Amino acid sequence: RLDDPQRAVACAVEMQLAMTSVNERNRQAGYPEVALGIGINTGEVVMGNIGSQKRIKYAVVGRAVNLTARIESYTVGGQIFISESTLNDCGDILRIDSAMQVMPKGVKKPLTIHEVGGIGGDFRLFLPPKKEITWIELKHGLPVQFTVVDWKHTGELGHGGAITRIAHNMVEIHSEVLPSPLANLRISLYDPDDHEISDDLYGKVVAHLSESPPAFLVHFTSLPPEAETCLTKFLGAALN
């Protein structure tokens, strides 16, 4: 259908809006909150039953599918990113909150991806405005070790640093190195006495603050309960 790109974006917005009720049920049941990052692309694909008589599945394959996965990998929870082709096919009914250039693997030229905040027309679905981030300064930084995650491969925890500011699902880290923008990190968190709290935090570099000394912002994509408890404790202590 000609309006497939528009319906896909509308579906993505509805999914994000539905996360409020999903997480409300999770809280009532004692489960952790979850978040979605959604990537959308438009292009030609091969679709159908693929396999043999022993094993067969209905699948979608092709370069457009691979690029969609790459676009999704740049998101953090709550975001919807679309490609230029999807933007062009949707027309001017989209609310675009931001755009950035990326260089995914397997692509020869930089691509512009767009963050969707809503869709008008017959759909009239919009995400709420983003809340202003409230940062809390820490008197004493929390030590961390981190490494860059290259898709499914994780290296050794080799880079040291310290968390100097905390916000909801975000931290500011000062370190000896400056990871690339949008790099995925695995982080080990320590208390002020250098006792390990967790070595299983994951986050994405969402902004560079300084090159010398290196400082950057990380948006958490996975936060174990023990790490969340620690950060919430320091956040609450700073507010009090």
Predicted regions, residues:
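Alpha-helical scaffold within the catalytic cores of cyclic-nucleotide enzymes
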Residues: R1-I38, T42, R63-A64, T68-V76, ...
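A residue-level detector for short acidic-glycine micro-motifs
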Residues: S73, R165, V205-L209, S222
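Cytosolic regulatory/linker segments at or just downstream of nucleotide-handling modules
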Residues: G77-V149
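C-terminal output/interaction extensions
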Residues: R124, P128-T134, S212-N240
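Short strand-loop-strand
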Residues: V148-L182, R186-L189, A215-L217
